[in-house]
Amino acid sequence: MKVYEILYKVYLLEDISLKEVQREIFRIIDITLGKSEDTLRLHNKNDFKNYCFNSFYPIEKDGVYKEGNIYTITILTIYKSLMTYFNKNLPFAYTTRIRGLKTQLKVLPKKKIRKIYSITPVIIKNDQGYWRGIMEKEEYMKRIKENLIKKYNGFFKTEINEEFEIFKSFEFKNNKPISNNYKGKSLLGDKISIEIEDNVQAQDIIYMSLGTGVGEMNARGLGFMGYRWE
């Protein structure tokens, strides 16, 4: 398994506010996926999409991304075929607000990872709403681990022994829930920082997580993680 990085340069056709950014990015990605039967099936299937993306870079301090400026979006995936498809098609994609320009590819080297941390908020869904007040931190951590193992098992079509540790330490970086707009609703998430155990299984799964995202709704720009090597 490899994690593929696509640096996607785009040109803004009009101003986009911070709260609109993720929606506008996944819109241009969705349009691109819809142009092929194979990638449309990936988009529509009720399963892990195994790609994730961050926000526009450079960051605008006033929270407004400007018409006429060029920004970079980082997209990560563990699917080589999807990387190839994005590289071929994203430069020609456009919406009423964003026009694609070019892509640049690389493979993230597989080195020992010391920690990962949220660039975009992590979402864990449950029927009662936001998790705080409903579950303890240990249950939240368990849900994160289970989600990662499901992604790993799904990609490799296996069932690994789950009796191993992934998290050496687990810290929340936000004091209150972070609101994320999706289809007119507010989804509450968290910024987390995790130190990673040294064992091979933990390192393999966390390397994978850079390409899949952590938690849920990764194809909507959530759970995108930064990392620090040893």
Tell me the role of every PLM-derived stretch.
Residues M1-E230:
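RNA-interacting cores
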